[in-house]
């Protein structure tokens, strides 16, 4: 081998070593970045668990429970339970929960897409969210770390704040909000009534409750926004949500991954879960650690009973696999009903029949409007009907029911005409 060839080979080896070294360090950096990303995702997951545990601790406070009990018309709900035929196949305690759900949704709490203007008290298309406001000391005292800011087009852009309270006692006073406020207040009521209840958090931005049925020996889904009882596939098969993690929280029962109850664990769902936390074992360990911490002060007999119940629930969730007949039945579940059509549409929660949902509402509206307005065809009456119809749809988009919207639309337009 001549000297030049030796130098060339030496240079080639050196270049190859440098290339291999660069590749090695690049792989190390990529692994480190991946580890950092996984650690970051795990930290975010843990933060959500911590936050939910802080929320449920308030349900065990004696003052909070006393305030909650003072709000519930127990005797009246007992009477309704006895006279209701819709839930006659259920046991007494479960029937009471059904009546509590109806009362909570229709009489106690009020849904809020947008707050009423602080000046004119109107809400709807006049109110526009313009961002977030800085929470006041009072807001922070009642857990409102987020405060939405709205302005009213009818009042020279007058501004109104909407604090998102997370204090369950404060919510008994305000009685308004969205799914977070609904689930928080309703779970407190169940605990005050001595039901075993779990606060359930969905990682795609919804919250609801589960109640332990002594009569059925299982956890039952309760959504106080929809007055829905024992319809766990409502979100995946009704609303069309693509769920990932669904976790239930209770001071005694601990922290439980109940995702299988709410959506079939297929490949798509597994992929969505991995996008949140890559390591499923991490989730199992985290929920177990929190559960053990929450149960630490319980007597051994109670801990043993809960461990047995855990094992039964694990088996129940493992065996859940919807047959085609069950899937067909669940496809009849409705899309989301609470909130304005515009708001539900923006969240993609109208369900699998989203295209026909608006047509159905229009058909219902036409029936209501025909009963509310005149059917004669004079020009003046036709113009009046057009005005009332426009007002009707404005009110419907604010989440008001067809019958109420029709009555208010006719009244509003005639009032305006009377002032002209």
PLM ranges: what are they?
Residues 105, 109, 190-195:
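Hydrophobic/aromatic-lined pockets within catalytic cores
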Residues 191-205:
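Short, well-structured beta-strand/strand-turn elements
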Residues 209-214:
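Active-site beta-strand termini and strand-to-loop segments that position acidic
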Residues 2-174, 178-181, 201, 216-420:
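Alpha-helical and coiled-coil interaction segments, frequently adjacent to or embedded
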Residues 206-208, 229:
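Flexible loop/turn segments at secondary-structure boundaries
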Residues 187:
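Cysteine-dependent deubiquitinase/ubiquitin-like isopeptidase catalytic cores across multiple families
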């Amino acid at each position: 081998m001549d000297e030049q060839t030796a130098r060339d080979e030496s240079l080639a080896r050196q270049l190859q070593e440098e290339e291999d070294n660069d590749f090695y360090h690049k792989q190390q950096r990529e692994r480190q970045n991946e580890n950092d990303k996984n650690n970051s995702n795990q930290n975010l997951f843990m933060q959500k668990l911590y936050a939910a545990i802080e929320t449920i601790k308030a349900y065990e406070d004696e003052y909070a429970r006393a305030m909650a009990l003072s709000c519930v018309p127990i005797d009246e709900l007992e009477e309704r339970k006895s006279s209701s035929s819709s839930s006659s196949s259920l046991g007494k305690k479960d029937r009471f929960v059904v009546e509590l759900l109806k009362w909570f949704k229709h009489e106690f709490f009020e849904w809020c897409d947008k707050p009423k203007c602080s000046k004119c008290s109107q809400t709807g298309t006049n109110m526009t969210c313009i961002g977030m406001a800085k929470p006041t000391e009072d807001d922070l005292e009642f857990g409102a770390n987020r405060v939405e800011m709205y302005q009213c087009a009818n009042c020279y852009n007058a501004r109104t704040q909407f604090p998102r309270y997370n204090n369950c006692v404060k919510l008994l006073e305000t009685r308004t909000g969205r799914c977070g406020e609904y689930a928080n207040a309703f779970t407190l009521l169940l605990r005050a009534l001595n039901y075993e209840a779990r606060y359930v958090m969905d990682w795609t931005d919804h919250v609801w409750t589960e109640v332990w049925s002594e009569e059925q020996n299982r956890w039952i889904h309760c959504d106080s926004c929809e007055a829905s009882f024992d319809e766990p596939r409502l979100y995946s098969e009704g609303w069309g949500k693509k769920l990932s993690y669904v976790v239930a929280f209770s001071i005694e029962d601990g922290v439980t991954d109940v995702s299988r109850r709410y959506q079939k664990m297929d490949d798509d769902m597994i992929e969505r879960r991995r996008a949140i936390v890559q390591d499923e074992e991490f989730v199992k360990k985290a929920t177990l650690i929190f559960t053990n911490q929450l149960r630490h002060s319980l007597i051994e007999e109670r801990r043993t009973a809960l461990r047995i119940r855990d094992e039964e629930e694990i088996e129940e969730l493992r065996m859940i696999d919807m047959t085609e007949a069950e899937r067909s039945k669940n496809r009849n579940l409705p899309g989301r009903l609470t909130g304005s059509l515009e708001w539900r549409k923006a969240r993609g929660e109208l369900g699998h029949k989203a295209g026909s949902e608006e047509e159905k509402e229009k058909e219902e509206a036409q029936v209501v409007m025909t009963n509310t307005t005149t059917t004669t065809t004079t020009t003046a009456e036709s113009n009046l009907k057009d005005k009332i119809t426009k007002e009707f749809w404005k009110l419907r988009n604010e989440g008001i029911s067809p019958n109420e919207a029709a009555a208010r639309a006719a009244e509003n337009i005639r009032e305006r005409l009377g002032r002209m």
